[in-house]
Amino acid sequence: LLTGCGSDESEPSTPPRPQPSEVEYPEVSEDQRVSITTSLQNKDHVQICAHRGYWKDAPENSVKAVTLAIENQIDMIELDVRTSKDGEMVLMHDTTIERTTNGTGKVSELNYKELLSYNLYHDGALTEEKIPLFKDILLAARGKIYIDIDVKISDYKAVYNLVKRYGMLSQVLFTVYDVSTARKVINLDRNAILLPVIYEMQDMENYLAVCKPLPVAQFNSAAFTEDILAKASGNGVSLFKNI
């Protein structure tokens, strides 16, 4: 069972992050921890997933939100991935940055250098946290916490390739909202671990036909019914529920 929770730029206090042209993506060895699939087989342990990281004490989708989740021994974090104008994968839930930063504009219409010039809010207060690169989050989380990736872009392949490059495929869930997207991910790698969102019984049946074995699925409130849950249990599907 998984349950989801929901500066002065002229004199920066910390060294600036690399600009897009300088971003490096090192090869790393495979993460040897127990896979999510194996971990979910422990039915005596309710795993906690921190939605957008540990946002209670840090900006959502930030490096600090990830490190605090690790420090508080959370089992998993959920993160949202988008792409900047110049093709860098960053963390941001919304299509625009107004709600979470002191900047304006769509993520897809801003270069990473522009995104980096803004700071993230937490509880209405501006912090020193910046919009992080997805790869920085993977490196911070690697070997320490599982990840549920809510991919907000159509290019699942780019996200998959980076996760694979960092040896984390057994540690990551890919959230999917429809069967066609599930097929795209499966075509990339039959062993990729999907987290389909279930709205009705037909969804459960469709995903089982495409993804079986299906280790876990997320159920919205309308799908949280006895017959759908029985169908999931009978097919070895663990429950993921936002509360």
Describe the residue ranges of each PLM region.
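Sec-dependent bacterial lipoprotein signal peptides
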Residues: 1-3
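Phosphate-group recognition and catalysis centered on beta-loop-alpha active-site segments
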Residues: 5-243
